[in-house]
């Protein structure tokens, strides 16, 4: 009967995982909530379980609670041991070993409080025996077999404190533990030699004392992980922790990013005086943490790159085999890939690769630059492949020999294409041919005679949407022999450098050779010059008489001198034809306008003015 009660208490203390293991061992259903699992296990026990099931229950219980009270026969001994355990007041006992044995916690529990272990033991005297044998909380091992992940930028020189469990010693939420360690003279010498003074009185060390915290799990190498409400003091001085990382979504508690802690600046660099570390944290149900202290040497990205090169370059045949595997036709697939294009630009720096690198775990051929990748992880160690966003640890990096050959063979291309047989060819950009548009457009040419041309096009009513081009710089005889399409007459205004008289309005054929054009419909020419920008209103040309060569029209028109251009027109030297009319004013301080219109001759009229350095050219196309 006593064995039954003992087994019943053991089963009642099991968690869901232990209950599932027990029911699975007995061949019972192990799905459902904890209450259902517990009822099945107790029913299994009452119905008379086999000795093998009883042995399994005791095995699970010993695994669940490795250290429990064997009995309460000597209650006075338990009381005295508990009182002596809780009475420790000094944070560090004098007989502590230097190699990391911690002292008792500074927080104590009142012996007769209802929540204290002693009170619970005293109150159990009048209760049944199975209630007195309730197990105590599990105590994790002092030095668990915890392995931390290697840090590529640090070489471990020595272990100062082996991984030690942060044991919960009371029922209070906030716990505190103390650890001590000492440095040897050789370790102190190495730290002092590596010291570098920075601006502002700061000091930097390449040989560092490094504190690491992680979960006390032995299943796999652990990453750095901090408990909640962590507070670290080194030799009584508060150590600044990294800032909180932004939460992934609202409603989740912020956590600090896990990383090793460099406590060298707070360590006593002496072999005669030990160093003390105080760690306080908030306990969590189901989570135990471990701490350790190491002496490490910090490395740079250049050192890691040199080590990566010393590992050697991977044979190009491995990459060719991977290419053939990717381009091998799948008989079940309707789409077959016959070629594979790969860029020679680094996805990190957007520049040409210099040291092509990728991880062995990656399935893609695209490489990234090893130097840039190491520099990026030196600033913020993430070790994520920039191509596929998967883990790419330093230990899995390789230098691709095939890409090394490609980069050495062609230095002027940024992309290549792999064929099915593993060969490759460069992908050079195609030069687009310059195509001349079939639709004509207005063309402006500058020459020695025309310094600043400006063309104005007047279209006829018959072809308002059609725009023709007149090239004023063509001097070859081939243009004269061919009959170009019909063009309209143009009037050019240019500055004559060798004019014998200054300020004279002259009409002369242009020295620029132009194609012959046909006459323009008179209806297309405006009857007056009011459409053009002139500083005064004038009389229509048709109403002027050709026998008035010396009449000054400006004296008859009231004009404000400040709006007149500074042109001095003295004489008129141009032949008059039957269909053209010329009006010349010879005022020395006034302005005049010369208009030439011809319907029977294909020539250009040039109005020359030396009063301004910038000529105005009007092309009527």
Swiss-Prot record:
ZnF (SP-RING-type) intervals: 331-412
Residues in PINIT domain copies: 134-299
Effect of substituting residue 467 to A: Reduces affinity for SUMO1
Start and end residues of each stretch annotated as SUMO1-binding: 467-473
Tissue: Mainly expressed in testis. Isoform 3 is expressed predominantly in adult testis, weakly in pancreas, embryonic testis and sperm, and at very low levels in other organs.
Residues spanned by motif Nuclear localization signal: 484-492
Pfam name, any one: PINIT
Keyword Repressor attached: no
Cystine connections: none
GO CC terms, sorted: chromatin; nuclear speck; nucleoplasm; nucleus; PML body
A GO biological process held by the record: negative regulation of DNA-binding transcription factor activity
Molecular function in Gene Ontology: DNA binding; RNA polymerase II-specific DNA-binding transcription factor binding; SUMO ligase activity; SUMO transferase activity; transcription coregulator activity; ubiquitin protein ligase binding; zinc ion binding
Residues annotated as binding Zn(2+): 362, 364, 385, 388
Cross-link Glycyl lysine isopeptide (Lys-Gly) (interchain with G-Cter in SUMO2) residue location(s): 46, 249, 430, 435, 443, 452, 489, 502
PTM characteristics: Sumoylated.
Enzyme category, top tier: transferase
Family designation: Belongs to the PIAS family.
Domain notes per entry: The LXXLL motif is a transcriptional coregulator signature.
PANTHER family according to UniProt: E3 SUMO-PROTEIN LIGASE PIAS2, ZINC FINGER MIZ DOMAIN-CONTAINING PROTEIN
Quaternary organization: Binds SUMO1 and UBE2I. Interacts with AXIN1, JUN, MDM2, PARK7, TP53 and TP73 isoform alpha, but not TP73 isoform beta. Interacts with STAT4 following IL12 and IFN-alpha stimulation of T-cells. Interacts also with GTF2I, GTF2IRD1, IKFZ1, DAB2 and MSX2, as well as with several steroid receptors, including ESR1, ESR2, NR3C1, PGR, AR, and with NCOA2. Sumoylation of a target protein seems to enhance the interaction. Binds to sumoylated ELK1. Binds DNA, such as CDKN1A promoter, in a sequence-specific manner. Interacts with PLAG1.
Identification of the protein by name: E3 SUMO-protein ligase PIAS2
Organism: Homo sapiens
């Amino acid at each position: 009967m006593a064995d039954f009660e003992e087994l019943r208490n053991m089963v009642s203390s099991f968690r869901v995982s232990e209950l599932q293991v027990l029911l699975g061992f007995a061949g019972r259903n192990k799905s459902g909530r904890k209450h259902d699992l517990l009822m099945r296990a107790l029913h299994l026990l009452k119905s008379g379980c086999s000795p093998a099931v009883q042995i399994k229950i005791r095995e699970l219980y010993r695994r669940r609670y490795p250290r429990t009270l064997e009995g309460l026969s000597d209650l006075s001994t338990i009381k005295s041991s508990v009182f002596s355990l809780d009475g420790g007041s000094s944070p560090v006992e004098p007989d502590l070993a230097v190699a990391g044995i911690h002292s008792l916690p500074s927080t104590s529990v009142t012996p007769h409080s209802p929540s204290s272990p002693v009170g619970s033991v005293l109150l159990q005297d009048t209760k049944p025996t199975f209630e007195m044998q309730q197990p105590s909380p599990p105590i994790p091992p002092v030095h668990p077999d915890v392995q931390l992940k290697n840090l590529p930028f640090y070489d471990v020189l020595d272990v100062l404190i082996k991984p030690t469990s942060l044991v919960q010693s009371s029922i209070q939420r906030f716990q505190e533990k103390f650890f001590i360690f000492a440095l040897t003279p050789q370790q102190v010498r190495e730290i002092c030699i590596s010291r570098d003074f920075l601006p502002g009185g700061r000091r930097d060390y390449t040989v560092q004392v490094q504190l690491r915290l992680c979960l006390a799990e032995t299943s796999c190498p652990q990453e750095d992980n901090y408990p909640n409400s962590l507070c670290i003091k080194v030799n009584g001085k508060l150590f600044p922790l990294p800032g909180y990382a932004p939460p992934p979504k609202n409603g989740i508690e912020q956590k600090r990013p896990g990383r090793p802690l460099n406590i060298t600046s707070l360590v006593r660099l002496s072999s005669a005086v030990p160093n003390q570390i105080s760690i306080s944290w908030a306990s969590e149900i189901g989570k135990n943490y471990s701490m350790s202290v190491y002496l490490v040497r910090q490395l740079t990205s250049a050192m890691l790159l040199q080590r990566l090169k010393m590992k050697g370059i991977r044979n190009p045949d491995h990459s060719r085999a991977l290419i053939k595997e990717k381009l091998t036709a799948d008989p079940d697939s309707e789409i077959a890939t016959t070629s594979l294009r790969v860029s020679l630009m680094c996805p990190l720096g957007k520049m040409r690769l210099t040291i092509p690198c990728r991880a062995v775990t990656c399935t893609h051929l695209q490489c990234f630059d090893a130097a840039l990748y190491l520099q990026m992880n030196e600033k913020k160690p993430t070790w994520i492949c920039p191509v596929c966003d998967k883990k790419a640890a330093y230990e899995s990096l390789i230098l691709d020999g095939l890409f090394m050959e490609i980069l050495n063979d062609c230095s002027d291309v940024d992309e290549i294409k792999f064929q099915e047989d593993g060969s490759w060819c460069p992908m050079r950009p195609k030069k687009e041919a310059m195509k001349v548009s079939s639709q004509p457009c207005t063309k402006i040419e500058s020459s020695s005679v025309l310094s600043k041309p400006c063309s104005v096009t007047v279209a006829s009513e018959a072809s308002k949407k059609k725009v023709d081009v007149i090239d004023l710089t063509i001097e070859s005889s081939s243009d004269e022999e061919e009959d170009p399409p019909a063009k309209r007459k143009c009037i050019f205004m240019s500055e004559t450098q060798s004019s014998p008289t200054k300020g004279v309005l002259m009409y002369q054929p242009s020295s620029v050779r132009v194609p012959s054009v046909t006459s323009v419909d008179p209806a297309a020419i405006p009857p007056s010059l009011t459409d053009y920008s002139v500083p005064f209103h004038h009389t229509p040309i048709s109403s002027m008489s050709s026998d008035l060569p010396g009449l000054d029209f400006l004296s008859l028109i009231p004009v404000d001198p400040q709006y007149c251009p500074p042109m001095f027109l003295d004489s008129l030297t141009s032949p008059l034809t039957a269909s053209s009319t010329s009006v010349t004013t010879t005022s020395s301080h006034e302005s005049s306008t010369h208009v030439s219109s011809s319907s029977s001759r294909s020539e250009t009229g040039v109005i020359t003015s030396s009063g301004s350095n910038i000529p105005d050219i009007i092309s009527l196309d």
